[in-house]
């Protein structure tokens, strides 16, 4: 433990050293730290009343830089790109609002989207942003992006300076959610080899400085077309959780990410804030029996979880609140689906903890309790092998807790940590603890919809034609809000779906609260429900933060 603390201290010291004296940006008196007579170091950052220093995890640093074509804003952890503008935005309630767009419409056949954009947006180099830039951006993203699926887009074209038309390959009613995360780049100044490190955008902030592996400094865009940012300077420090905690203790940051591990600690001058998320954790439950393989020879199916009665037993036999209390230290909410609290969530997913009911389902399935406390059926023991990702202590602890609860039901459990290089293949036959959660109903499609002619969903063996049909109809719907009902029916329509009374091919456990140490006096604006990923989402509205 001493070695770990010393390593964290060194990391914290190195990063803070960089922050206080590096590079291209002058260090002003208000950004320096003062040393009190006691030797304690405190930050005077808050004295400016218009700047903030934030500690994020190292994985939050964009490997390819700040280029929307390579995942910035729209990669695995979706967030607002800040440096660039988007056509639309997601509101606090996850409905759609406008940014660059002033209006949009979709053709009756769903294959053409027309978007009108504002005419007062300027790039940071003084050039106007036009529909040509929008079309160029989307065509570039379609051609080069390796982190997002843009197969639904055929091409984009500018029909005049303020109108862009998207020609689709198929109906895609949730296109406005895609438009909310793709930042617009300037056609006249875009070079894929250099843009990521030197982005030019029209968003709320300009990238002032980027020291790879250490920090990013953003400054308010003086020519931004919207309300002027209240926070004029935003410094992001990339550091491990231990170092972020030490930085907060030293008063060197204004907001620092943390986890339940540190939630019992107290940091003088800071409060612990918990923001709700749809950052969920859940096990896939292969819904077909073993014996099949993919074309590449990967084993598919699981004899135990292929029985729907077993899957239903697992779903009501787990005490989610106990997990939250014991693993997350109380910072989380029970998860019943991949999209809890989203506009397209079906509340029929919710279940009560019912160990007696779970035992009855296992009895009904023919799994009889043995004298050794393990159930048997036809001479076969009830066994679950559970996978979790290596190096993730929270997933490991959740897996161990789930295993303990299942053993109380008479199911013998074993655990194994695996790397993501093998996890996807292993999950086709063995339950794996996943992390999901997005601001788009497309995640339902990605998890549950049958993929092509494979006869199965992408991540776990499962298929239901009715569920597929509802999701296809949802994507083909001409009205976005009306499509929510179809997404809900895909979850449960009264007869079939992916909930407890249906096929239940996944068991969802918890939504993890995103925790932050926040300096007293810093007023963080109202947060949307955070998606998967404990990083940039918290600064989606950093321009609206203030100091009291």
Go through each PLM region and give its residues.
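Periplasmic binding protein-like
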Residues: 54-56, 126, 249, 255-258, ...
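N-terminal lobe/hinge region of extracytoplasmic solute-binding protein
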Residues: 55-106, 200
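Ligand-site clamp/hinge motif
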Residues: 222-266, 412-414
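Alpha-helical secondary-structure segments
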Residues: 53, 130-137, 161, 165, ...
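Detector for C-terminal structural segments
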Residues: 211, 215, 315-346, 350, ...
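Aromatic- and charge-enriched surface segment that lines or borders ligand/interaction sites
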Residues: 102-145, 165, 247, 303-306
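Gly/Pro-rich hinge or "lid" segments in bacterial periplasmic/extracellular proteins
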Residues: 91-92, 171, 178-229, 233, ...
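Surface-exposed binding/hinge segments that line
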Residues: 105, 109-112, 148-189
